[in-house]
């Protein structure tokens, strides 16, 4: 039942999915956001740097960025700005090794690492009456998985969730990213991920074989040799199987909106959970014809998807 219609119509040039995706990431200009950084210590003696916009509101939105993003990502900054202007406090996560400083432990972030999201929720829990989770791409997978996988008891203070451009089937998305038209995206990810692995190897020289980087040609290769092994999975296949959020969507009990553009170059057909939305009373799906990956460009300071986030949170 909750498959929602949408009114997204991009400016003419941005009907091309790669332009919508690339412009949003590389060329968008956003108004300054003044965050206050706080460091959270984790149970395994590591840390998370969280950037806050705090006001008198008793409502807070936790923002979860995508692969190799941070609180500096344009979509995080714009969403934080819009939400704060409309009465919400904001906590923008920086995952492990994403705040500009290497984390202490061998483990890093990944698409299924919901324990770190849980730590941030517990940190803000005493000070707010209503908590909302918003995730983009990998961060959206975290939000959906956290709400559906029953590893953690969900606080009654969590009121609603929004996820944007989410590879809910990680294996399907990894195959889509291997298409030749997506080479630029994969190259950009692998460039920064490889640099991080060199720093990790300097920190933990006996824990993995850095020479495997020479074999890495795709993100799947990287996940096979590094992401999976460092974070306790057998291989990329095991990681994708266990961390994909699609399998957990039927268990979601809070109002949750997923917006995936039909022309998203990162997504396979399996990343559009139509059946799950049809069978759910809490999970809402929007599939605009255009939008690219975390694009949804529109005129003005804020993008169409950011207004959808605000509208959904306001209603819940």
Feature locations, PLM:
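N-terminal cap/lid segment of alpha/beta-hydrolase-fold proteins
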Residues: 14-55, 297-300
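Conserved alpha/beta-hydrolase
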Residues: 72, 80-104
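Catalytic nucleophile-loop/oxyanion-hole region of alpha/beta-hydrolase
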Residues: 96-132
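The serine-hydrolase catalytic nucleophile loop
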Residues: 69-81, 269-270, 299
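Alpha/beta-hydrolase-fold enzymes
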Residues: 132-230
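Catalytic histidine-centered segment of alpha/beta-hydrolase-like enzymes
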Residues: 291-304
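Short beta-strand element of the alpha/beta-hydrolase
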Residues: 58-66
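Short beta-strand/loop motif that positions the catalytic acidic residue
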Residues: 252, 258-260, 264
């Amino acid at each position: 039942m909750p498959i929602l219609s949408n009114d997204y119509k991009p400016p003419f040039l941005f009907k091309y999915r790669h332009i919508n995706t690339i412009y949003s990431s590389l060329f968008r200009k956003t108004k300054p956001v003044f965050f206050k950084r706080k460091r959270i210590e984790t149970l395994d003696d590591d840390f998370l740097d969280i950037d806050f916009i705090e006001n008198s509101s008793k409502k807070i939105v936790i923002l979860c960025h995508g692969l190799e993003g941070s609180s500096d990502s344009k979509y995080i900054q714009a969403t934080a700005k819009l939400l704060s202007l409309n009465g919400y406090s904001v906590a923008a996560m920086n995952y492990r090794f994403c705040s500009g400083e290497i984390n202490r432990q061998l483990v890093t972030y990944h698409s299924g690492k919901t324990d770190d999201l849980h730590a941030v929720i517990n940190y803000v829990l005493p000070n707010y009456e209503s908590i909302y989770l918003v995730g983009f791409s990998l961060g959206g997978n975290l939000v959906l998985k956290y709400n559906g996988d029953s590893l953690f008891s969900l606080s009654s203070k969590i009121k609603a969730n929004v996820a944007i451009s989410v590879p809910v089937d990680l294996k399907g998305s990894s195959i889509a990213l291997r298409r030749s038209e997506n080479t630029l995206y994969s190259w950009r990810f692998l460039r920064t991920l490889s640099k991080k692995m060199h720093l990790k190897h300097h920190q933990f020289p006996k824990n993995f074989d850095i020479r495997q980087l020479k074999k890495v040609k795709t993100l799947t290769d990287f996940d096979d040799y590094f992401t999976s092994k460092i974070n306790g999975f057998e291989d990329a296949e095991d990681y994708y199987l266990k961390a994909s959020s699609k399998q957990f969507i039927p268990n979601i009990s809070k109002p949750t909106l997923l917006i995936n553009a039909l022309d998203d170059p990162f997504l396979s057909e399996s990343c559009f959970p139509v059946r799950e939305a049809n069978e759910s009373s809490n999970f809402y799906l929007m599939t605009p014809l255009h939008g690219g990956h975390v694009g949804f460009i529109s005129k003005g300071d804020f993008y169409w998807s950011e207004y959808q986030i605000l509208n959904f949170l306001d209603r819940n």
